[in-house]
């Protein structure tokens, strides 16, 4: 092909040689006077050729080198080229403007010859898919590089004998402009599937923005060509498309005469291998929708989206964009498109095009789209959401066209539902089965023709759908049989829906409700119920059809039949995202799931959704049908299919890897976590996971109900006007766990209908591997552990490798989990604590956190809450808290936050409580004393326990005194012992210090202990200490720590000890005063010495000379000694002070030059101004005095 263009203002004929499929026709218009620029497919620089009829070089069908930047074949000088497409001589512009491009009656800009028929009818369907998206988006995800470097369409009118294929080999294999020449911006909320570009080195998340181009390079050419493509005319026939103001009138007279495809041409297309493509049930109109409004490619021509509402029908969902790009560079194998059925999608009332499905098609679903429901545009980001208003707050998420094309537009064929926008209720979590061979992320569109799609789109999951997991993950024989059996008699009976396992979420202030309570609490009409059973119906029909599929937990945020996302913002946090069940082996689904789905189908089909309301108030009312024994379905490539999950088809009640909550797989139960009358959790999902030795404490994946869905009659977490019912009541019956001989799902006789079926909190940060067998609480290794409240904190990090939600697990992703109210959140905290931390319980009381005292005590905010409450708590409330923390008191003592709770009990608790805690400390005094937080508990205990217990506690440190004294934590305990305990009981400490006084006095921690001994011990105990101090006074006064001990003796010691120290200082005042540490000692000597000793020290300074100057002058200039001089001025006798002043006067002028001398002058001025003494020249304030 060739296109006349201007290359650097010179007319040339641009020819491409990148495709080996192109045929060179002699009738191609070529100006012999124009040089030919020949580009090769391998990236060579453009070379001028002398003649236009020269044969095209056979370019290789090469893909770009991964390490190269941009696309192979891009020239560095291409950014300097201006292109001008020349029209045919007989052609006139239809509308003018950048996006006008109308048609001439005699000319078609769409190629009419077979010279671009590139495939020769031999290319496989997957290659056509690639080529189609290449034509649409230049191999760049969502128009990443929608800048043309090659010709798009022939401008001539060639022979019309061949079929009108639209696929070239790789149109933009050699893009003239790469990503580096133009800035690319990322629109807000635009997300795509990773790896969606042909070229591995392209910016995956880049989307070409109308404003992102700086020079408008090549944009007009693209817009000119695309706006005149048949897609433009085709869109106009359907009542929508680009509505440029300057082209509307010009197109009015041409609409009826312009047909994009003739009937015979369309037939040729179908005969030649269905070159048109269909993706996800959506028509792709010639690969490009040139709606300029949606994505204007000219800088400054970014039109507003005011016309979008006009382009859409009143009931249309504008979320459907163009076909999604395939995600690999090479062609996909044909096996990826197996198990698919072709569909017929009417593009127009007069045109029918058969299209092959892509790999994410919905099998067997005919989705007709009338002329008003065709795609709106390629880059229509603004019209891809529909706002629905509910009484509750709704979070409406904007999704891109690439994400939303997995929904089916089945709303046109669902007039019997008539779902109003205000009638939607978010679906609870259900397990759905996707149809075989289709997108494993969908929740099964088998019921799309009845209720609309119950779809979980791909953006919730990050796993690759192709061949990663076994294709047959359900044992659906039993479920399908039960569904077929019960479908007939549930069609018209409203009572059949009494046990419907569908939990409708109510208002923002309520927990999930059963249909009965939902009807009581708010108005429930058939529309609400129909929306609620939407996903269940899809699941039921999928099982009834016997189609194996991927198990998917549909989220509380759901997609209605129009594809819009509806989220109940009033739901409790942590409940909004889906959980995908992807097990390495088959997962068992109970029959009640299928029965619930069939019941939902019957309720919706007959409009009897109001009959969903049951007559009882229990949390769940499962369908009363017998549970057949599901059998594992064999799969050839599944290595685990040969080993049954039942362990010889029998659940051993004593085995740690057996059923989760039951003894037998088919043991009758009153109700079992909402699964069915005889289908306990162990018989459904638990037994399947039992083979791993794991427990599913948080993951009952029932068909239509959540395990933690509570009724209005349940007292758990139900806030009344006065208080909150203790959380541990339903779990532990006080403080002990009920060891029922039956499964947990079977309520005990003492448990009312409102008793929670939720197991106790699991014991790891992500739901540990603890199994609940026979009511006992065990971890994954089979060791029975404490079931007391708060025990989960002790084993929070003890989850085994086989934990269901552990990071090494392959069944669940911990980041996608949703927990019950009492379960451990991803942060490791219970929901009660999480809610308290989020200020949802501003008036929480101590009695309301019963069962969670340990957990609260180990939390920063919870511990502070308990501390504040304990100060003013009643004795009964203190005892309530004490009973829970006593057994794990040591654990709290060494906890960063829990230790404060223990301290509060030593401070405010009763004597019995203090003694009980002191008993817990016995035997652990040394370890606690050396621990950062335990040492604080020991210190508090020493302050408040009786002397007998004090003596017992202190005696445990005997033999470890020096170790504690030199420890950063233990030294505080020793100091507290010296302060609080009777000195007679501390003789072992004095004995331990013998010969170690100097070493300890120069120790950062030991010096503190020495000072405490000097303060509190008996004189005969301190004498040996002081003797050692006097022997090392000269060294200690100059030590960074020892000087504090000497100062302490000078301040608090006996006069004779002070005199000994002063005697050591005399004669060395000048030297020691200039020492950083000794200067402090000299100050204390001047301050605390007797009058005689003080006078001697001051006189030494005044009479002593330091070289040519006096010692006083030297000291006044020194950074340390000047403080000694100031202290001397303060404490000297009046006569001696006058002598000092006269000694200082000759040096006043010089002192003004020194920083520390100014301190002396300030002291003098302050002193004499206070006393009114005239110092002559001193009275004039020197400059810089501070």
Curated annotation (Swiss-Prot):
The modification Phosphothreonine is found at residues 112, 514. InterPro entries: ARM-like, ARM-type_fold, PUM-HD, Pumilio_RNA-bd, Pumilio_RNA-bd_rpt. Residues 22-73, 233-272, 485-524, 613-648, 742-773 are annotated as: Disordered. The modification Omega-N-methylarginine is found at residue 796. SMART domains: Pumilio (SM00025). Residues 1079-1083 are annotated as: Guanine-nucleotide binding in RNA target. It is linked to Spinocerebellar ataxia 47: A form of spinocerebellar ataxia, a clinically and genetically heterogeneous group of cerebellar disorders. Patients show progressive incoordination of gait and often poor coordination of hands, speech and eye movements, due to degeneration of the cerebellum with variable involvement of the brainstem and spinal cord. SCA47 is an autosomal dominant disease with a highly variable phenotype and incomplete penetrance. Clinical features include developmental disability, ataxia, and seizures. Neurodevelopmental disorder with motor abnormalities, seizures, and facial dysmorphism: An autosomal dominant disorder characterized by global developmental delay, impaired intellectual development, early-onset seizures, poor overall growth, delayed walking, hypotonia and/or ataxia, and facial dysmorphism. Some patients have hypoplasia of the corpus callosum and cerebral atrophy. This is Pumilio homolog 1. It comes from Homo sapiens.
């Amino acid at each position: 092909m060739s296109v006349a263009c201007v290359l650097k203002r010179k007319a040339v004929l641009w020819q491409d040689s990148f495709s080996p499929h192109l045929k060179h026709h002699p009738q191609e218009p070529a100006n012999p006077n124009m040089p030919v620029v020949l580009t090769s497919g391998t990236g060579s620089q453009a070379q001028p050729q002398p003649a236009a009829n020269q044969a095209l070089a056979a370019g290789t069908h090469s893909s770009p080198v991964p390490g190269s930047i941009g696309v192979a074949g891009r020239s560095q000088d291409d950014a300097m080229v201006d292109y001008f497409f020349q029209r045919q001589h007989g052609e006139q512009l239809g509308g003018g403007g950048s996006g006008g491009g109308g048609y001439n009656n005699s000319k078609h800009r769409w190629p009419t010859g077979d010279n671009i028929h590139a495939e020769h009818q031999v290319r496989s369907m997957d290659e056509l898919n690639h080529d189609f998206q290449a034509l649409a988006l230049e191999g760049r995800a969502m128009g990443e590089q929608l800048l043309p470097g090659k010709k798009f369409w022939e401008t001539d009118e060639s022979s019309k004998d061949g079929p009108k294929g639209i696929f070239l080999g790789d149109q933009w294999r050699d893009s003239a402009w790469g990503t580096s020449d133009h800035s690319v911006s990322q629109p807000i909320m635009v997300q795509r599937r990773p790896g969606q570009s042909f070229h591995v080195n392209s910016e995956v998340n880049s989307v070409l923005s109308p404003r992102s181009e700086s020079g408008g390079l090549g944009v007009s050419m693209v817009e000119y060509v695309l706006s005149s493509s048949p897609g433009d005319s085709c869109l106009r026939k359907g009542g929508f498309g680009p509505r440029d103001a300057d082209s509307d009138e010009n197109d009015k007279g041409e609409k009826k005469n312009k047909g994009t495809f003739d009937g015979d041409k369309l037939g040729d297309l179908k005969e030649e291998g269905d070159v048109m493509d269909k993706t996800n049930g959506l028509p792709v109109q010639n690969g490009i929708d040139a709606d300029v409004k949606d994505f204007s490619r000219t800088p400054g021509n970014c039109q507003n989206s005011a016309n979008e509402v006009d382009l859409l029908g009143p009931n249309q969902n504008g979320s459907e964009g163009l076909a999604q790009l395939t995600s690999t560079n090479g062609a996909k194998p044909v096996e990826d498109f197996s198990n698919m059925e072709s569909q017929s999608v009417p593009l127009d009332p007069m045109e029918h095009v058969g299209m092959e499905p892509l790999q994410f098609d919905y099998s067997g679903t005919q989705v007709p789209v009338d002329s008003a429901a065709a795609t709106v545009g390629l880059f229509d980001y603004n019209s891809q959401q529909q706002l629905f208003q509910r009484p509750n707050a709704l979070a409406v998420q904007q999704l891109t066209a690439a994400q939303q094309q997995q929904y089916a537009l089945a709303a046109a064929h669902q007039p019997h539902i008539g779902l109003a926008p205000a009638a939607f209720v978010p679906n609870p979590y259900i397990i759905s089965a996707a149809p075989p061979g289709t997108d494993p992320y969908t929740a099964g569109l088998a019921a799309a023709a009845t209720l609309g799609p119950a779809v979980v789109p791909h953006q919730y999951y990050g796993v690759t759908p192709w061949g990663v997991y076994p294709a047959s993950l359900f044992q659906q024989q039993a479920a399908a049989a039960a569904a077929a059996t019960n479908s007939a008699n549930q069609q018209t009976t409203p009572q059949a829906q009494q046990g419907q396992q569908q939990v409708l979420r109510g208002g923002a202030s309520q927990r999930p409700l059963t249909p009965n309570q939902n009807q009581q609490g708010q108005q429930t009409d058939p529309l609400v119920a129909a929306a609620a059973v939407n996903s269940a119906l899809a699941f039921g029909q999928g099982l009834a059809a016997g189609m194996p599929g991927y198990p998917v937990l549909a989220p509380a945020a759901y997609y209605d039949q129009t594809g819009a996302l509806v989220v109940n913002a009033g739901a409790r946090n942590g409940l909004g995202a889906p959980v995908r069940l992807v097990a390495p082996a088959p997962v068992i689904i109970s029959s009640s799931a299928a029965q619930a789905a069939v019941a939902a189908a019957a309720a919706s089909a007959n409009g009897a959704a109001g009959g969903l309301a049951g007559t009882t108030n229990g949390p769940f009312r499962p369908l009363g049908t017998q549970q057949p024994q599901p059998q594992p379905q064999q799969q050839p490539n599944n290595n685990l299919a040969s080993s049954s999950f039942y362990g010889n088809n029998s659940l051993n009640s004593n085995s740690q890897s057996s059923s989760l909550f039951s003894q037998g797989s088919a043991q009758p139960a009153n109700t079992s976590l909402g699964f069915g009358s005889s289908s306990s959790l162990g018989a459904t999902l638990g037994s399947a996971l039992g083979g791993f030795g794991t427990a599913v404490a948080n993951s009952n994946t029932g068909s239509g109900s959540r395990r933690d869905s509570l009724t209005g009659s349940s007292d758990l977490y139900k806030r009344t006007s006065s208080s909150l019912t203790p959380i541990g009541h339903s779990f532990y019956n006080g403080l002990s766990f009920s060891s029922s001989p039956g499964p947990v799902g079977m309520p005990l006789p003492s448990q009312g209908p409102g008793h929670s079926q939720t197991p106790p909190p699991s014991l790891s940060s992500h739901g540990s591997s603890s199994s609940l067998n026979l009511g006992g609480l065990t971890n994954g290794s089979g060791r029975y552990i404490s079931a007391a409240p708060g025990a989960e904190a002790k084993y929070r990090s003890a989850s085994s490798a086989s934990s269901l939600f552990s990071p090494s697990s392959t069944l669940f992703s911990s980041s996608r989990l949703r927990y019950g109210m009492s379960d451990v959140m991803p942060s490791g905290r219970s929901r009660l604590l999480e809610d308290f931390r989020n200020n949802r319980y501003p008036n929480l009381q101590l009695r309301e956190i019963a069962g969670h005292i340990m957990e609260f005590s180990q939390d920063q905010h919870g511990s502070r809450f308990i501390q504040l409450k304990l100060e003013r708590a009643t004795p009964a409330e203190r005892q309530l808290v004490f009973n829970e923390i006593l057994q794990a008191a040591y654990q709290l003592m060494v906890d960063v936050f829990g230790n404060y709770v223990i301290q509060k009990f030593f401070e405010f608790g009763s004597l019995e409580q203090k003694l009980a805690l002191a008993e817990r400390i016995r035997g652990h005094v040394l370890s606690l004393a050396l621990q950062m937080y335990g040492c604080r508990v020991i210190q508090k205990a020493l302050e408040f326990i009786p002397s007998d217990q004090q003596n017992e506690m202190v005696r445990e440190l005997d033999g470890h005194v020096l170790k504690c004294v030199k420890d950063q934590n233990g030294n505080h305990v020793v100091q507290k012992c010296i302060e609080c305990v009777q000195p007679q009981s501390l003789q072992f400490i004095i004995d331990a210090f013998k010969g170690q006084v100097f070493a300890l006095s120069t120790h950062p921690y030991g010096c503190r202990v020495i000072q405490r001994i000097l303060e509190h011990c008996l004189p005969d105990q301190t004498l040996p200490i002081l003797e050692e101090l006097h022997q090392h006074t000269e060294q200690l006064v100059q030590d960074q720590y020892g000087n504090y001990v000497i100062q302490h003796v000078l301040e608090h010691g006996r006069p004779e000890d002070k005199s000994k120290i002063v005697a050591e200082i005399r004669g060395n005042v000048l030297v020691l005063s200039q020492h950083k540490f000794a200067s402090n000692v000299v100050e204390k000597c001047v301050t605390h010495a007797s009058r005689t000793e003080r006078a001697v020290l001051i006189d030494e300074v005044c009479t002593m000379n330091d070289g040519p100057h006096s010692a006083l002058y030297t000291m006044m200039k020194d950074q340390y000694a000047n403080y000694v001089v100031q202290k001397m001025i303060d404490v000297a006798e009046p006569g001696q002070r006058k002598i000092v002043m006269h000694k200082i006067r000759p040096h006043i002028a010089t002192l003004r030059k020194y920083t520390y001398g100014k301190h002396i002058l300030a002291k003098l001025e302050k002193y004499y101004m206070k006393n009114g003494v005239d110092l002559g020249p001193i009275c004039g304030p020197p400059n810089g005095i501070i």
